[in-house]
């Protein structure tokens, strides 16, 4: 019998990590009491994994960065409901919050399309990324999860991206 833990420190479990579990089970001597989702540099029980991008033709995925209390999460809940109920699309939304309620980091992960959505993890490859707190472009890699050819929207008072160096200007056109 082999067992392990996941979801430690509220970390999301990704398809790449699940594949690592199955790869571990196929070994002659699989690692027991393993962990996925964190880098365990104390007991070294983490399984190595490679992130993969699962194709979902016709599905649109979005990741929106907000500031707790700015209305981003509420607006996204309304938007995904409208897309699903009024637009007749399959729709899914996950929301993650910082420990601070007001003023903390919020992330909205939205998916919608014409086929049922079976993804049970956060968006890590987005067609659309929006950032509603201009300071986030220096604090976080807000374009990390943007697909090649995806759309990046920065809600800011600036007229030029020169103020955001090095990110996201270096990854956008």
Located regions from the model:
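Fold-independent oxyanion-binding glycine-rich loops
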Residues: 3-5, 67, 113-115, 132-135, ...
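Anionic-ligand anchoring segments at beta-strand to alpha-helix junctions in alpha/beta enzyme folds, i.e.
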Residues: 61-125
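ADP-ribose/adenylate-binding Rossmann-like module
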Residues: 145-162
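Single conserved hydrophobic/aromatic residue that forms the stacking wall/gate
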Residues: 163-173
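Phosphate/diphosphate-binding loops
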Residues: 1-29, 122-136, 142
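Short glycine-rich, flexible loops that bind phosphorylated cofactors or substrates
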Residues: 137-139, 160-161
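Gly/Ser/Thr-rich loops at beta-strand to alpha-helix junctions
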Residues: 7-11, 66-74, 173
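Flexible inter-domain linker/hinge segments
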Residues: 8-61
